[in-house]
């Protein structure tokens, strides 16, 4: 169901407004056309940074100095972005939701091209050409993009390519196999490959993004297994103290210290993925209660 409230899209727009579009933008939050016009201006400014659709460039990549995951973030709306690098993290950040709320299909083909090109041989957003930078959080950003495409009924991938839900499930299934009970009592490491810097670090964004995907898959499919993983991952993060009793979210901890000595730097995107996942879990539980009541 397409959300009719322009205030929902205004939240998306306010996130985009942090991208630093050139010049002042007039915005009336009580006027749908004003919101869409402002969003269009910012979307154009953001997409001007993207070169993956040009001859000789790679779809789904941003030019230096941006990382692969940042392009994945461009494809999915995240409620917040990392405050120090706002202009970097979410430049493509609402292209699926931009289409969903405005009906503007101008960037749909570019979005589709990028999403499909980066799927990887195992259809789980682990392309071989990204092994030097591919962490669990990086992969999860693309998984969240695929899940957003499923949730918003974005155009299906070309024939022969799995659907968006299947691709998001591929990311989830791959990451459940990486759950590491041998160190820190559980959790995902930051990096997948031991040769990458950060392999011995368990960070909040990797585990938070996994929680986000699990919670949203639970809501989308009604499958309790996803909900169980969402609960398990959140409980682990909370048990380590990465989320404090007053919901302050730290960045992560090293396995050498059993994840007890943490980097307490607080990035807003860490909190953001948990907020979105928590909302999905709230709706999932509410739906279960409703269905039980109907029976």
Positions of predicted regions on the chain:
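Fungal secretory targeting signals
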Residues: 1-26
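Aromatic- and glycine-enriched pocket-lining scaffold segments that form the walls
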Residues: 165-236
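Non-catalytic carbohydrate-binding regions of carbohydrate-active enzymes
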Residues: 130, 281-295
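Low-complexity, Ser/Thr/Pro/Gly-enriched N-terminal "stalk/linker" regions
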Residues: 20-129, 159-192
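Carbohydrate-binding/catalytic loop surfaces
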Residues: 55-65, 127-133, 137-149, 185-206, ...
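Well-ordered alpha-helical scaffold segments within catalytic/enzyme domains
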Residues: 24-29, 72-86, 90-105, 141-159, ...
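Alpha-helical junction/boundary sensor with strong preference for TPR arrays
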Residues: 50-54, 85, 122, 153, ...
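Short sequence/structural elements of tandem HEAT/ARM alpha-solenoid repeats
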Residues: 109-113, 228, 292
């Amino acid at each position: 169901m397409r959300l009719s409230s322009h205030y929902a899209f205004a939240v998306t727009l306010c996130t985009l407004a942090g991208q630093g579009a050139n010049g002042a933008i007039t915005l009336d939050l009580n006027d749908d056309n004003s919101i869409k016009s402002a969003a269009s201006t910012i979307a154009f400014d953001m997409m001007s940074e993207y070169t993956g659709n040009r001859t000789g460039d790679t779809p789904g990549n941003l030019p230096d100095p941006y990382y692969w995951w940042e392009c994945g973030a461009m494809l999915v709306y995240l409620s917040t972005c990392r405050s120090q690098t706002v202009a970097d993290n979410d430049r493509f950040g609402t292209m699926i939701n931009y289409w969903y709320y405005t009906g503007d299909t101008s960037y749909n083909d570019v979005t589709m091209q990028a999403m499909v090109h980066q799927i990887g041989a195992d259809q789980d957003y682990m392309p071989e050409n990204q092994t030097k930078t591919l962490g669990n959080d990086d992969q999860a950003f693309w998984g969240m993009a695929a899940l957003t495409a499923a949730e918003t009924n974005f155009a299906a991938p070309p024939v022969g390519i799995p659907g968006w839900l299947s691709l998001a499930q591929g990311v989830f299934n791959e990451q459940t196999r990486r759950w590491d009970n041998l160190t820190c009592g559980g959790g995902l490491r930051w990096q997948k490959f031991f040769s990458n810097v950060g392999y011995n670090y368990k960070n909040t964004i990797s585990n938070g993004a996994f929680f986000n995907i699990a919670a949203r898959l639970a809501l989308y499919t009604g499958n309790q297994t996803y909900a169980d993983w969402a609960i398990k991952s959140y409980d682990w993060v909370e048990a380590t103290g990465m989320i404090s009793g007053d919901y302050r979210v730290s960045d992560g901890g090293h396995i050498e210290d059993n994840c007890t000595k943490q980097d307490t730097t607080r990035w807003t995107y860490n909190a953001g993925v948990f907020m979105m996942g928590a909302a999905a879990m709230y709706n999932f539980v509410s739906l279960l209660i409703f269905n039980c009541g109907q029976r």
